[in-house]
Design a protein with these regions (language model features):
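Feature captures hydrophobic
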Residues: 1-122
Length: 122
C-alpha cells in the first residue's frame, strides 16, 4: 500500500507541477500525512524532483495532511481545481513556513488567472 501511495504522490506532484509551471523552480521538502483506518502514513516529498520516501519529514517547510480516501479521490483526475476546492473546504490542510504557503498560493492564483484569460480569448 505504501509503495502505491509513493507512486501516487509522485505522480500527483509532477502532474500539478505541469499544471503550474511557475512552481517548477521551487526547491521544497513537503511532509505528507495520509490518515486512514486508525493509522497515519507519513511521507517526505522533495520538489521539484518529485522524489517520495516513506519517512517522517523533519526538514519539511510545508506539511500537508488529509484522509487517504480524499487523497485517492484527488489523484484520480489530479486537477488543480479539485485540489484547490479540497484546501478551501478543509478536506486537505497545509501548514508550515508562512512565506512558502503564501508564495504557493500567489503562484496558483496567477496560474488560474492565466487560464481564465486563455478561455476568455477563445
Amino acid at each position: 500500500m505504501s509503495e502505491d501511495a509513493r507512486r501516487l504522490i509522485s505522480n500527483a506532484a509532477s502532474g500539478l507541477l505541469e499544471q503550474i509551471p511557475a512552481l517548477k523552480p521551487l526547491k521544497l521538502v513537503v511532509g505528507i500525512d495520509l490518515h486512514g483506518r486508525g493509522d497515519t502514513q507519513q511521507f517526505r516529498l522533495v520538489l521539484p524532483e518529485c522524489e517520495v520516501t516513506k519517512d517522517i519529514s523533519t526538514d519539511a517547510k510545508v506539511h500537508v495532511e488529509m484522509r487517504r480516501e480524499e487523497f485517492n479521490r484527488l489523484t484520480e483526475h489530479n486537477q488543480l481545481k479539485d485540489w484547490q476546492q479540497a484546501f478551501v473546504t478543509g478536506r486537505v490542510k497545509a501548514t508550515g513556513v508562512d512565506q512558502y504557503l503564501k508564495l504557493i498560493q500567489q503562484v496558483v492564483e496567477k496560474q488560474n488567472e492565466r487560464e481564465r484569460l486563455k478561455k476568455a480569448r477563445h
